[in-house]
């Protein structure tokens, strides 16, 4: 499988690497990591990365995006990483490339690229890229190894989630054969400003229960604006405040935005992906997302989740 992907990459002198909007550690790690791999193994190629700002993961080396003029795409290859749907891809210019290639580990939603390499057995897209590098015997650079390891760590929940397998640790071990500082990665992931800690405390106090084992947070546009932070930080960043609560098997973070109600679903027990798909979203079995039209849709989703848990919704 990976030899075919390598053949596609070899065929183009100009390559632009895309990933999903509002990047997490896996999106950035796979993007930076693949770019570093290609640059070190094929120095004659012009490889660039594009997308919106790194946000919370700006500490990652190589996280500043490249300037790419529109005409660069003529005759170029666009690589799409860690993305299951076209509307999630950051920078729509991938459509103008001569050829497209996708690597992804999400549950399949739609065909996006001319050539696709997707495999849900990987805990992260970074794990998939690491396997690609290993099986095709590409030279691993310190930046590539560090970036890919970072994405594996973040998408596996520091190797805690069910998607973590022996394959995960084997690939992590493979990456660690190339010298880089693990302490720098964890310092970036765990170090928080006082304001961030206070923000989390504020959201802990907002946690409510829809049933015995289903928890949620709902944040209005006015409440979000009062925090002084962006909606993505609230939506993706605060869903974790409900994790590891005894007796809570499903938790959802709803955040009103200009584009609708952002929804982050998580579970320690159930496959909540079908619920996300029902509401136009997607993702993984136990970590998915969607954008809802309004608060009433959020209530409907909560009722569906309570039914999944076999409980009566108290809304």
Which positions does each model-derived feature cover?
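Short glycine-rich anion-binding loops that position phosphate/pyrophosphate groups of nucleotides
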Residues: 21-23, 83-86, 106-108, 221-223, ...
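Short glycine/serine/threonine-rich phosphate/pyrophosphate-binding segments
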Residues: 25-31, 87-89
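Active-site cofactor/cluster-binding pocket
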Residues: 61-115
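Short alpha-helices
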Residues: 106-171
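Generic enzyme active-site microenvironment
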Residues: 18, 22, 80, 102-103, ...
């Amino acid at each position: 499988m990976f030899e075919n992907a390598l053949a596609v990459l070899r065929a183009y002198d100009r390559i632009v690497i895309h990933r999903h909007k509002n990047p997490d550690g896996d999106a950035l790690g796979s993007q930076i990591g693949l770019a570093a791999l290609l640059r070190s193994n094929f120095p004659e190629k012009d490889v660039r990365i594009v997308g919106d700002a790194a946000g919370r993961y700006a500490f990652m080396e190589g996280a500043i995006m490249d300037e790419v003029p529109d005409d660069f795409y003529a005759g170029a290859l666009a690589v799409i990483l860690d993305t299951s749907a076209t509307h999630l891809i950051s920078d729509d210019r991938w459509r103008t490339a001569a050829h497209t290639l996708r690597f992804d580990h999400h549950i399949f939603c739609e065909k996006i690229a001319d050539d696709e390499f997707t495999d849900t057995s990987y805990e992260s897209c970074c794990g998939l890229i690491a396997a690609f590098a290993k099986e095709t015997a590409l030279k691993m650079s310190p930046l590539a190894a560090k970036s890919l390891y970072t994405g594996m760590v973040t998408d596996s929940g520091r190797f805690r989630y069910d998607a973590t397998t022996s394959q995960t640790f084997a690939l992590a071990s493979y990456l660690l054969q190339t010298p880089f500082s693990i302490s720098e990665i964890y310092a970036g992931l765990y170090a928080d400003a006082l304001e961030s800690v206070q923000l989390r405390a504020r959201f802990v106090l907002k946690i409510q229960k829809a049933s015995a084992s289903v928890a949620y947070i709902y944040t209005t546009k006015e409440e979000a604006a009062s925090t002084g932070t962006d909606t993505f930080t609230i939506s993706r960043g605060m869903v974790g405040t409900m994790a590891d609560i005894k007796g809570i098997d499903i938790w959802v973070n709803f955040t009103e935005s200009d584009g609708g109600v952002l929804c982050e679903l998580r579970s320690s027990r159930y496959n909540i992906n079908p619920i996300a798909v029902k509401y136009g979203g997607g993702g993984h079995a136990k970590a998915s997302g969607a954008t809802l039209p309004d608060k009433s849709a959020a209530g409907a989703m909560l009722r569906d989740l309570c039914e999944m848990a076999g409980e009566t919704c108290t809304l």
